């Protein structure tokens, strides 16, 4: 049943020309939606699915530190690329790591991130992303 539902994604919510995912059929694809979609596919065991690979290419193409849903999108894009592994993960981590370091704010000894979703959530999400290669969380242990 899951395979049938997943295969329906291509015709319903993935943009044929851009390869990103939309929220609803016929909608515009977006960075955060694509990140959540390819991570969800991987969680369902579709690690090598062409939708995941195409979605990853879309995320590299559309990456922007000015993205409206930057934190939310990267909270899913980072583990999706981590699961892809190899050079893809290495390139993604260099890209997101450099971006997050530039966006970090300093208040004395305190380093944090801010955004429209709030300082606490942004800091927790970005610290989790930066910590992925250190395998602190069991989810990211290999």
PLM features: residue spans?
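Large, well-folded core regions of big proteins
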Residues: 105-110
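C-terminal closing repeat unit and adjoining cap/tail of repeat-based domains
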Residues: 92-104
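An alpha-helical repeat/solenoid feature that recognizes helix-turn-helix modules
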Residues: 1-57, 62-95, 111-142
